[in-house]
Structures are given as C-alpha cells and as structure tokens.
Amino acid sequence: MKKSLLVEGDGGPLSMVVAAANVPDATLLEATLDAVVLERPPAEPPDWTQHLSLDAGFDDDPSYLAALDRDYTPHIASHRTPPPPPERRFPARRWVVERTLAWLHRWRGILIRWERKAANYLGLLQFACALLWFRRLHRLTNGSPQSYVR
C-alpha cells in the first residue's frame, strides 16, 4: 500500500491519497495534487509561484508535467544528472513530509493497516490529519502542546 501525502512548509497535511503498491508514482502525484482540501491563496505578486519538492522517485516527465499543469514550480531530485557539489546544494525539504508521516504513524491503526477497505483506511488517515491540525491550532492558541489529555 502506498500513501501519498502533500504538506505545507511546516508539515501540516493538505491532502492524502492511498493506493495499491503497483500504482505509478506519477498517477499518485496527480491524484494527490487534485485532492487538496483547501483553495490555494492567490499569487501575490502575480509572478509568485508555489514550490513542490519531490524525491527522486518522481524524476520522470509525467510527474514534472503534473506539477507544471497545476502551477507549481517543481523541485525534483534527479537521477539523470550528477549531484552538485555540497556548497551549491539547496537545503533539504523532504524531511517535512517524513516528519508528518512519523506523526501519523504514532497511531497503531495507521502504522499497521487493519481495515480491509481502502475507503475506511483513508477515512482513518484523514481523521488523523484533522487531529494533527487540531493539535497545531491548540498549541498556537494556548501555548503548550501538553496542556490537554491525549
């Protein structure tokens, strides 16, 4: 089973898609970008674009075109060219997605899939994403993340 997750810069989940393990990454990327639950803010200034960081598994033309079709500037780690020297590399951004997946995997029902139907599992994932947003909102408005009972 594959889980495809789109997060904002601080790790807040924006969309989640589950699929069989044999689904190509480009197809899953298109579904993930189309499943965003919030409208994107208008570009200010007009030439401003949103960036999409992807790992080397998405280094193909369909993934690149899927990002461009949805007005993202893709940043895809490349298999095609050698990596630049360390002083010219951009900072890593993929860890934000990995951290959000680690937050989601704290729940046993998500780490190990017990549900037979994919729709039930997706609902559980979406509920967990909503809890992540609730915890974040609670922390931002009340201060301490430990001030409520788990």
Where are these regions (language model features)?
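A general lysine-centric signal
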Residues: 2-3, 117
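Short, structured patches in soluble enzyme cores that scaffold and shape functional sites
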Residues: 3-9, 17-20, 56, 78
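Mobile genetic element proteins and their domesticated derivatives, centered on retroelements
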Residues: 5-6, 11, 29, 55, ...
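Active-site beta-loop-alpha junctions of metal-dependent nucleic acid enzymes
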Residues: 17-42
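Helix-centered, glycine/charged polyanion-binding patches within enzymatic domains
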Residues: 22, 41-118
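Generic structural signal for secondary-structure transition and capping sites
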Residues: 38-41, 109, 132, 136
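C-terminal domain-tail junction helix/linker
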Residues: 123-150
